[in-house]
Amino acid sequence: MKRAHSCCFLSVGVLVGSFLAGASPAAADVTPSPAPGGPPFGLPTATGAPLPVTPPSVPAVCQQVQARLSTSNGLFPGPVEAAPPDTTRIQAALDACAGSGKAVDLVATGASNAFLSGPLFVKGDEYLLVDAGATLYASRNAGDYQKPGDVAKCGYIASQDNGCYALINMDGSNSGVIGTRAPNGNLGTIDGRGWATIINGEYDESWWALGEQAKSGGKQNNPMLINGYGVNDVTIYQVDLTDSPFFHILIQNGTGLTVWGIEIDTPAVGARNTDGIDPKNETDVVIAHDMVQDGDDCVAFTSDPGTPTENATVEDVHCYGTHGISIGSPTAGGLSNILVRDVSLDGYDSFGNQSTDDNGIRIKSEPGHGGVVHLVTYEQVCMTGVEHPLFFTPHYSSSTSTQYIPIFQDIVVDGLRATGSPSPTSSLFEGYSASEPLQIELAHVILDNTTQSSQNAYVQARVDDSNIIPAGMDVTVTSAGEVPGHVPHCVIPPFGPPPPSGPPGPPAQ
């Protein structure tokens, strides 16, 4: 039984002025002081990527593939598990439909509603379509996912995590993974079975247990659900992604990514490194109307040297028990023009599990993997039960490298409310140095616990109508004047499939 998220935030009047760090919410004035080296800086705001007026559409069908299996518990007889019977016939349909602009449609027939497959490759100008009522299950045979060449062994712990193909590999541009919606709201489902025991793995344990074991050293070689590299205009729409062994979605080094109206349903505890939606080295990204619970980041933007991530919008996305909406830790290629608005974060998943790294909005990096992160705007953000509502650090690891220094500039938080904060709770504001401070504006930010980390340092902050003021070594605070906007009045929706128009975001009142 999933826990209902019916919590509500009470509307409060606008509080004038700002509050001392760690103090109870009571009006106080901010005495403007000049920023080092000149007058107070002005922070521009991100525009992100433009949202389409209408959601993506379900494509026409090129070929239909009918289910031949059924299961009540997500498992199949031994011979079926050892040699998944649907890989070849689904891939044959995908190969035949490549370039058509149409879909290979997986459909239930009578009592048969399941497919069992190893890695699939979606070519250019085609889509994999999973009908509501049908479930595509991932093989648990590690050998099915093994990549060729001098790489790690899939299903093993190794020094690298490069041994496994994903279940679904985006192998061409203008492609996607799409589901249909049943009258009761249920979506077509792709189930990674991360909880199931691996066949032909290093140990007699599940994918998730292998990930937990890798904490003590090495990296887990588990398959992702959806992965793409160097492909443009990828659409992931109206599909339920469940229990991934590793990342749910990683799309990298392309232009044009839309993730719209999906549900990611994986527990917050015991499912290590099961990130939700990860765009890496991507340009023109839209992530909208999604419901996400998993064992790592809800959304995480990253970049490698020479390949920036830029022009992205995250809108009407709701996160449960995750590690937050994050940027980093790799930021070496730079990240810019990222807009996050009308989002909510609950520190607990629908099963009642508390996040294992309970963050709200987070920018993290470290020397050796850092770059310039600038023009990032958060608007109308709601949180409940979040341990670290605001988390900004260029020292995410203990690296002492003098190359690829993290720099965070033009970070704006305009409209944020956090309630139900656990104990202890703290926020972190940290820049790299006095010459490379964190530049941040906080407007209309109200937390029910304003405690800050003792690591706070090197910050230039502008503040208006907020009850948290960064404080610490080499921290300068100036008044932002009267910034247009307001503290959000919030209702966090219960976790479940997003409705056709997207889940209700925090209302702008």
Predicted regions and their residues:
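Extracellular beta-rich repeat passengers
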Residues: 351-509
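Short, T/G/N/S-enriched strand-turn elements that build extracellular solenoid repeat scaffolds
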Residues: 91-97, 114-124, 139, 176-179, ...
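Short glycine/acidic-rich loop motifs that flank beta-strands on beta-rich extracellular proteins
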Residues: 102, 116-117, 138-141, 193-196, ...
